[in-house]
Amino acid sequence: MSMNMIEPMEEHYAIGIRNSFGITIDPVTGNMWDTENGPKHGDEINLVLPKFNSGWKKIMGPANEKEQLSINIPGFQYSDPEFSWDIPVAPTAISFVESELFPELKNSILVGDFNTGNLYEFKLNEERIGFVFEDPLFDDLIANQGEPVNEIIFATGFSGITDIEVGPDGM
């Protein structure tokens, strides 16, 4: 087997994904979502549609126009994250809650982080392809350093969240 062999790109669902600890499937749309972790900035939540290009290794977090041009790979479409953190929180877990006990969470994604032990709730837009926020600080879809994140905090005080599971009883 040649070490110079190039894999056929049409066999890949998505490319450019970096250090993803969390992957989940939307039970309503069947769309894939993931979390990505970076070394210095730009931790992400992504909607991973077929032929998605997350941009790694050239882009962490949202891209400017010049960066987007630098990752043009035929057959794949770069997309900015649906949300990102300026400083790393290490989003490691992502899940939809389908329990009848929590109807208020049916249109949300829960994300846990390893660095601070926070559990976040992201409310989905009507099409379930992005998030809606009340706080204008999130209009840029970034939690910038020093900005309050109260709107998205669901629970705190955990130690290094690595997974989110809903038990058979819905809890």
Describe the residue ranges of each PLM region:
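Beta-propeller domain segments
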Residues: 1-153, 159-161, 169
